[in-house]
Amino acid sequence: MSESMRGTIGKFALLSMTFAAVFNVRNIVNNNIELGLSSAPIFLFATLVYFIPFVFIIAEFVSANKNSESGMYDWIKQPLGTKAAYMGSFLYWFVNLFWFISLLPNVIAYASYAMLGYEYAFSPMVTSMISIVLFAAATHISTKGASWLGKISEIVAYGVFALFAVYVIGALMALNGDTPPVEPITLEAMTPTINWATLGIMCWIFQAAGGAETAAAYLNDVKGGQKSFIKVIIAAGVIIGSMYAIGSLLVNVFVARGDLSYSGGMVEIFTGMAHYFDLSAPLVGRFVGIILFIAMFGAMMMWTAAPVKIHFSEIPKGVYGEKTTQLNKHGVPVRAAWWQFGFVLVMLIANGFGSESVQEMMSTAINLTAGTAMLPPIFIMVAYFVFRLKHDDTPRDFRMGSRMFGMGMVSVLIVIFIVSMTASAFPPGVDLVKAFFINVFMTAVFAGLAYLWISRFEKKAAKTSTSTSTSTSTSTSTKNKTATQTH
């Protein structure tokens, strides 16, 4: 791998890449549909209690692993060992396979708005075919490295920042006018109902505020190294958390919660604003569709590349085939990226044939990633707890407070995550057997297969090591014996 190709992206490019990976405008609408205006304080809670501390954890791990290629594997390896590091990075990659299935229909919906001014209802099979083409394009671009992704992410960041600012200014102007908001912003409306269903939905808010660890896959591509990375990742955490909270507070100024849809919700709130200000709703819909299509496609490219780098770039040599883990000059395992495309291809075809509607297709994919999406962050948190407990003397430039503060903070996060993950996996009003099969059993099966795979590799490696050691010992003994006889 050519070192001249690395260290090529600046701070704003990294901020843009983090922004593209983490901030997803559809999360504002999706959680508003589920929770109403109470999603705003929950987003604020998630930012303060989870996202910012989690960003500090990432910053500390980065500071302690300056030469890491991908981040997550090395972070877990020192505190928990090779097997846990492999399992953590595998689950991170595995969970994201299902996330692509839920994201791609949104990309198509926004492309439809951009070209037609409205959402065209494709059949699930046609949606799957278009998704395959889009994912193939994203996979190809993602193998071009951080410099390409940085440039694309900068365009995404400018567009989404501008779109967000326009909506916030428009909403504030409307609130200062004579016409009241469609749904009044009151303390009662913002007060969340704490029950089992809410705890499960919080899992998605935590996931919406997560993803900053993906940027660590490009640590070696950043000008200024780990010091620049830490500054940018902390700034990104504060900015993104604030945008989620503000956006969630103002989302129902022009459109009621009940009138929003999962696939086109962001366009719907902008066309609602267009009606309020007597602007052309189709024209605004097309403009917003173009920006959101670019934003979603940019996010997909980040998430296409990062999990592959995290899982395949630093695992021990021999776990997979040599060509599968071989990095190109940009530090990307190209063959692994196309293997990932192959898995998603099969899932898209199966989903297309097995779903009666795109909404059902998205719902199935969302259910498959519900609680399991929280497993990789839990691996990182447990690793951090053990790191502060047993390896706190590791040299690093950044620490999240004292040893006890760091351990206490991450312990609270682990408890919150486990409760939320359980509630998400078993939501109220569903068949518990079906929920167990979809949200627990399938993940457990694949995780079990991964565990057997890495255990088999470790046994084989240990046997080879013992054999080599015995051979070396025998050879040395023979040489010594021959030398003695000669004398």
Write out the residue ranges for each language-model feature:
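Hydrophobic transmembrane alpha-helices that form the core helical bundles
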Residues: 56-60, 68-131, 140, 296-310, ...
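Membrane-interface "cap" regions at the ends of multi-pass membrane proteins
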Residues: 1-41, 45, 51-59, 67, ...
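C-terminal membrane-solvent junction of multi-pass transporters and transport-like membrane proteins
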Residues: 5, 10, 327-330, 374-425, ...
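TM-loop-TM module centered on a large, flexible mid-protein loop between adjacent transmembrane helices
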Residues: 74-75, 81, 235-301, 320-369
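Membrane-water interface regions at transmembrane-helix termini and the short interhelical loops
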Residues: 2-5, 63, 113, 133-156, ...
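Membrane-interface loop-to-helix entry segments
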Residues: 111, 128-180, 233-238, 366-379, ...
